[in-house]
């Protein structure tokens, strides 16, 4: 398959049984680190929401959410969440969280339009987190500070796993490198955005790529972002170099959330100003929700990275094209 990478001479250092134990080890340690360093409280989260609420993540604006009707409620439609980006900010207010406090949760989603490969699945599992900040903290200094805390959690987890498993060596650099999408475009003008991410990740080991969603000087955005959660001038992806596949691997997407001005501007740029009338978006415009920063951290990608797996299907159960399943089996890649 054209999207499948088969590493030379790959074989997993862990069998299926030990992989399951290792997955739990990674997840337990990392989420405890995240809660500790970002001062987060674990909460329960919805699997589905009312599409009329505006709480579902619109992602890049083209992905179709999974929806179903509810018999008892006269055929009312519910949508399976694509992420909890909007819901978390709403929950911080509803649950009464104050400045400096935050929440995290397990988020499970179905992305039916995903093109699957070694790192993409139609099943998405991530830690979604959000915390309250002040208006004056809506700046890049705040973003960088939180990114460093998240990166510290990643570094601590890698060190912990290297102690638990002899075959795992520490490969993350001591510090993460910060760069904007425009700076990347200037450094690598002849490359695609994904190629730029690969080159900077391979050169630096770990990169925080900032300002994603708006058009660059070349007239094209680095990548798509929903207009109604991240402020496109105050967001980022954490991308690390992954030698098993020789790729830049995105582990986290995060950002300072939109205020009224950023929301209205981005809705207009995205060609969907009518979304300003949805309940969630209207609550931002009316100043009813707290200022926040938040993000998502891929659980399966974290496990894949720290366990040095070749395919995300080695650490999560999903459905894959038959050709992919067959080719993986022929190269000692055991999909769950």
Predicted regions and their residues:
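Extracellular structured ligand-interaction cores
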Residues: 101-103, 124-128, 204-206, 246-248
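Class II aminoacyl-tRNA synthetase-like tRNA-binding/catalytic domains
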Residues: 2-120, 128-132
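Generic recognition of stable, solvent-exposed alpha-helical segments in well-folded globular domains
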Residues: 21-25, 29, 138-145, 149, ...
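Extended, charged alpha-beta segments that form solvent-exposed binding/catalytic grooves
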Residues: 105-191, 195
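A generic secondary-structure signal for well-formed alpha-helical elements
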Residues: 34-41, 150-161, 310
